[in-house]
């Protein structure tokens, strides 16, 4: 998927002194504005140059009540007490006001105090409004000096942005509706999944999942591997094979001695006593030879049995497998990240232009969007060009890093439904950072 592809022509006519939303609620699609042009027909007799301003919500504005409701952190007792206070105030207002005898001077003082309180409250409200919204000048156009001005503004549907014109002339904005990185319909992606889904799928899955299977294989193979010392202590055969080989050797020696005895008796009958003495010597020598063998055999088996061994390779493989388990962290707004691979170089920070590969899935495992080949998806981190969960989850990654980002609905698209993404959807992204500028 290539990012920022134009879909259709965008146009907006901004009349003087009328705040105009940048994006229609009925068509929540990302827009890119490239030109502002002046309407040469004046709407009043003053014919003053028109100044185009953009008004947007302050990202640093701390609306605690809104954040608490968004994250589910609110005090039920406190809300109940607020409701009770409101009910009491309503009851007091419904009661008939009692007439009190007061001097005219006191009434005048009270009215002045009330006016001062109302003025201070209105001043505070105006300050809050000023803190909540920011206003910036984009261009000043006049039929005498300049009719138009090139722009390059990208506005996402979730941004609260309006345009205001001050002056005598209307200003028209033109550009394109563009393909948002998360706006790919399910049907389009299913068709292309077999064609271009091999590159990054292998990159992500092989680097993480194959490690788990390779660890299991390593355990099986390590169980049958012996060290050189173990090979020396326990050769190919078992204890029974050692005993069988020694018995065969003794039988061969007995056959040889019997054969010699038979020949000697057949040819030298007169040396019978000498032969008997020779036989007893052979028997004694045979016993002396067998005793060291048995001793050596017992030592072998005993030494093998009582051998103290260090940590086995299986235990080492299990410890390595535990070390490879991704570390899970919870960030702002409930965004969860799991680092699969740690890259090299500096970490991405707010304002950096980052290039990403990614695979986006719903909670049920269905893939709704991906960028695994071709041109990477590039955006400016922390500037609101993507959903808030990406600005939070991508921060801190370095080139080559792979990470899983689990984004709750308030930090994704919230109640807004997009093609392939139902409303209030939790989104999961497997991402890889490929460039930082």
Curated annotation (Swiss-Prot):
Gene name of the record: FPR3
Species name: Candida glabrata (strain ATCC 2001 / BCRC 20586 / JCM 3761 / NBRC 0622 / NRRL Y-65 / CBS 138)
Free-text function comment from the UniProt entry: PPIases accelerate the folding of proteins. It catalyzes the cis-trans isomerization of proline imidic peptide bonds in oligopeptides.
Keywords: Isomerase, Nucleus, Rotamase
Record bears the keyword Ion transport: no
Protein's name in the database: FK506-binding protein 3
InterPro entries in UniProt: NPL (IPR041232), PPIase_dom_sf (IPR046357), PPIase_FKBP_dom (IPR001179), PPIase_Fpr3/Fpr4-like (IPR023566)
Compartments where found: Nucleus, Nucleolus
Chief place of localization: nucleus
Phylogenetic classification of the source organism: Eukaryota, Fungi, Dikarya, Ascomycota, Saccharomycotina
Catalysed reaction, written as an equation: [protein]-peptidylproline (omega=180) = [protein]-peptidylproline (omega=0)
Single GO MF annotation: peptidyl-prolyl cis-trans isomerase activity
């Amino acid at each position: 998927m290539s990012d920022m592809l134009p879909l259709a022509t965008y146009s907006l006519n901004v009349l003087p002194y009328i705040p105009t939303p940048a994006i229609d609620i009925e068509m929540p699609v990302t827009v890119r504005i490239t030109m502002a042009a002046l309407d040469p027909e004046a709407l009043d007799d003053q014919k003053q140059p028109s100044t185009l301003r953009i008004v947007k919500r302050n990202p640093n504005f701390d609306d605690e009540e809104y954040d608490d409701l968004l994250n589910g952190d609110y005090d039920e007792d406190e809300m109940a007490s607020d409701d009770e206070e409101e009910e009491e105030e309503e009851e007091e207002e419904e009661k008939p006001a009692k007439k009190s005898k007061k001097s005219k001077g006191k009434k005048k003082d009270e009215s002045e105090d009330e006016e001062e309180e109302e003025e201070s409250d209105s001043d505070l409200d105006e300050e809050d409004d000023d803190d909540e919204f920011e206003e910036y000048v984009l261009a000043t156009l006049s039929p005498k000096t300049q009719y138009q001005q090139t722009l390059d503004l990208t506005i996402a549907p979730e941004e609260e942005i309006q345009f205001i014109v001050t002056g005598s002339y209307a200003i028209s904005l033109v550009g394109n509706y563009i393909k948002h990185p998360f706006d790919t319909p399910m049907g389009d992606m299913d068709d292309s999944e077999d064609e271009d889904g091999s590159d990054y799928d292998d990159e992500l899955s092989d680097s993480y999942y194959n490690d788990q299977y390779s660890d299991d294989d390593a355990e099986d193979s390590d169980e049958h591997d012996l060290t050189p010392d173990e090979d020396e202590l326990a050769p190919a055969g078992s204890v029974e094979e050692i005993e069988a080989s020694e018995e065969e050797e003794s039988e061969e020696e007995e056959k040889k001695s019997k054969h010699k005895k038979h020949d000697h008796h057949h040819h030298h009958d007169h040396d019978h006593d000498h032969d008997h003495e020779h036989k007893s010597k052979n028997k004694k020598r045979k016993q002396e030879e067998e005793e060291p063998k048995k001793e050596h055999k017992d030592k072998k088996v005993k030494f093998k049995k009582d051998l103290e061994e260090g940590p086995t390779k299986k235990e080492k493989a299990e410890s390595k497998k535990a070390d490879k388990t991704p570390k899970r962290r919870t960030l702002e707004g409930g965004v969860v990240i799991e680092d699969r691979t740690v890259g090299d170089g500096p970490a991405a920070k707010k304002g950096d232009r980052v290039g990403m590969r990614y695979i986006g899935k719903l909670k049920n495992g269905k893939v709704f969007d991906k960028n695994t080949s071709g041109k990477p998806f590039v955006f400016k981190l922390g500037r609101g060009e993507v959903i808030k969960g990406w600005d939070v989850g991508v921060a801190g990654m370095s080139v080559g890093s792979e990470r899983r980002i689990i984004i709750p609905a308030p930090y994704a698209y919230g109640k807004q439904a997009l093609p392939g993404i139902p409303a209030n959807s939790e989104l999961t992204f497997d991402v890889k950072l490929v460039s930082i500028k």
